Amino acid sequence: GMMTDTGGFTYNSNRPEIFFIISQLLTKGINKDKIYRNVFNNYSLWRLRLMGYVMYTKLNVFAEYHAAYFTLTRRDLKHFHFMKGDAEGLVNMPLQIKGMKLSISLREDTEKPDTIWVSLRSVDDFPCNKMAEKYFNGGGHLNASGGHLNCTMDEAEMLVNKAIREFRW
């Protein structure tokens, strides 16, 4: 949890106590490399294919707003043999693009029609939690938030486009 909840120790919310606890665990002999491999290098082939598909085909970049979003439809999820957890972390990937401050993912619920799950990630002082509250019936932390919408994917995309263009903090 310490590794994933801190974004691999990259989030601004990291506190010195976490690093003290990690140093104590290392002193006790934990195998940090094995833990890392089990957490981050343990994906299925279908998850990797999904990641490539999303970044190549589904990613919409708004360079002038330092933002990006992508969609995952039920059809996409079925095609890539989606299993719970396969979408975890995908929303962080667009933040690797130079200059990006905000990334949003829209994922159709696999069972409930017209239910869209929204994940938001940001860097620096961009308050994605405020955007989640204002536009996506959600909330969360400064740089990691979520929400949901009861609408079609087309309607959700229109709302994301509006949010990216209008939101000011």
Each language-model region and where it sits:
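Hydrophobic helix-and-loop "lid/oligomerization" segment in the mid-to-C-terminal part
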Residues: 7-135, 140-169
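His-Asp-centered metal-binding catalytic motifs of divalent-metal-dependent phosphohydrolases/nucleases
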Residues: 1-7
